[in-house]
Amino acid sequence: MRTTLAILFAFIVFVSMNNSTFAQSAQGNVFVVTNFERAFPDNGSNREMDSLTTLYMEKCFGQENEYVVSYKLLRHWWGHNNRDFIQVVEVKTWDDVTKANQKSGELFEEAWPTEAAQDAFNDAYNKYFTGKHSDEIYSEVVAP
C-alpha cells in the first residue's frame, strides 16, 4: 500500500509539473527569408528595380499562389551597409514551403511563357544582385 501511494504521489507530482506533455503544441506559420546582396549597376535605377521586383513577387507569390499567406520585400533603410534586400514569404506549413516554390515556378513560366521572355526578365532583374544570398526558414512563435 505504501509503495502504491508513493507511486501515485510521484505520478501526480509529475503530471502537475509537466501538464504541457498532454497538450498539442500550437504551430505557427512558416517564413522563408531570403537575404540578397544588391548590386548597383550603372545602367539601373531604383525605380526599375522596384518595378521588376514588384512584378515578380505579384506574379509568382501573389494571389495566384494559393500556398502563400503573405509576402514582404524589405530594403535596408539605415546603417552602414545598404546592400541588404530581403524577401519574406509566409506559408502555413512546412509542406507548403515546397509547394509554394513549385507553384511560383509554374507562375513564372505562365507570366513569361517563352525562354526569350524569361531570359529578358532575368537579365533585367538579376543585374541588381551580386549573386550572394542566404536562405533561412523560420517558424512563428505561438503561445500554447
Task: State what each model feature region is.
Residues 67, 115-118:
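Residue-level signal for alpha-helical context at structural boundaries
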Residues 20-84, 90-109, 122-144:
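Short S/T/G/P-rich N-terminal loop/turn motif that feeds into the first structured element of a domain
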Residues 1-27:
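Bacterial Sec-dependent N-terminal signal peptides
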